[in-house]
């Protein structure tokens, strides 16, 4: 459990730089992805830090065991992957998160549909 700030000081913000950093970290390896994503969410929703700022991104990368220089060197490749992912999502008619498209093309959207997704994957739906 995290004590969230429902109206953080820096929301809405530009989440793109943090998203690019997550992709760059995934490509680079060597750290803990779960800790990185949790750290970015915590920075925004608990610590009220601006996740669009390079210093915040560097801190989150370093705390999760990644090279903080990815905030500089990796963002371009992260942005390219992000754009490609966005194009694929639009082509698949994705319109929210979480959103899952299974091999049959059936879509599951929303936290409240994860149980249905589990049933589908188990062959029970």
Locate predicted features.
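Structural alpha/beta surface segment adjacent to cysteine/selenocysteine redox centers
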Residues: 1-44
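C-terminal cap of thioredoxin/glutaredoxin-like
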Residues: 39-125
């Amino acid at each position: 459990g995290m004590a969230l700030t429902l109206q953080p000081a820096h929301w809405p913000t530009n989440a793109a730089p943090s998203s690019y950093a997550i992709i760059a970290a995934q490509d680079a390896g060597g750290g803990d992805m779960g800790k990185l994503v949790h750290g970015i969410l915590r920075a925004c929703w608990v610590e009220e830090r601006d996740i669009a700022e390079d210093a915040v991104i560097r801190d989150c990368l370093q705390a999760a065991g990644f090279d903080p220089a990815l905030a500089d060197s990796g963002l371009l490749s992260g942005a390219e992957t992000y754009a490609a992912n966005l194009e694929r999502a639009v082509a698949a008619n994705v319109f929210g998160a979480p959103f899952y498209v299974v091999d049959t093309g059936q879509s599951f959207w929303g936290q409240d549909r994860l149980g249905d997704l589990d049933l589908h994957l188990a062959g029970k739906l």
